[in-house]
Amino acid sequence: MSDDSDLTSRRKPKSRRAPKARTRGQRVRRGILFTLLALVLAAGGTVYWLYSQLDGNIKSVDIDKALGDERPEKLPTAGQNLLVLGSDSRAGAENKELGGGGAVSGARSDTAMVVHIPEGRSKAVAVSIPRDTLVTRPVCSKSDGSDLPEANRVMFNSVYSLAGPACVVKTVEKMSGVRIDHYLEINFAGFKDLVDAIGGVTVDVPQDINDKASGLNLTAGPHKLNGTESLAYVRTRHGIGDGSDLGRIGLQQQFLMALLSEIKSQDLLGSPASSYKIANSATKALTTDSGLASLTSLAEFGRSMNGVDPGSMETIMLPVAYDKQDRNRVVAAEPQAGELWEAIRTDATIPESAKKSPATGG
């Protein structure tokens, strides 16, 4: 009896401890699973919040709805055409300060380029439209719903301030016969912040620049420019050439190539959320057509451009001649301008004669 009692007494503690050990282990494993699940959900929620915020930063314009069907025909082999505008909007405190204070109201298209990406997307060409070009502005709808009548001999950069981006697209399509597929606009402050966010952009300054109006002073040679310096560089007109808009177009084109090279090297378009700081700066600055107005659409467009080498992108100024009535203005030079637009419309090689501008700004 005593032996049996001893055996029973030894077994009882063992039978009581085993369930407790299993329960404790289950609780630990269950706790780990719940923690991991919470972390996954939190990470997913954070990613969703980041994407939602970045998507919400992008402003858009429904170009197709605004322009309707009265547009150039989209040819099967026409590639892709993107209108890029640099807006000198004074909206917001930072834009106002960068734009030179309160002396100028409203906004204008300070920089305008038609970027043509041929079929296959292995190369591209950027055509700069001088802001002082006299154009025929078509009938456009204003933001209040009223119509802005057609007008001849108006400055190209005034179209934006009078009727907004859709009218700029319509004006470019009218003067070129080129169907614009996408629209992208960046403002003063956004340009500055984007350059600062990516760590600056290196450019090879072609000649000494001493612009008293902007305070930009650079010697010829390579310089890594921050955001404020970059903005002054692409906007300087008194520090180079004849002081007109034509002189600075070369600097704008050069800077665009350097900026695109930096963006491509950091894969900012292919993976726009890889760096939240950069993506936040970029998306806050952007206004696009509705087809590009999301991170997903921008990333897809960026990945489709991976085959394009910014170093081989051709940059051309729209051939212009000094206006006979006002030497401070220019007009499209014919037949060069017509040949240039025809080549872009048909995705053909641009003839050398279409790259020569009678007015150079030198």
Which residues make up each language-model segment?
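Non-catalytic, solvent-exposed segments at the cell envelope interface
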Residues: 2-362
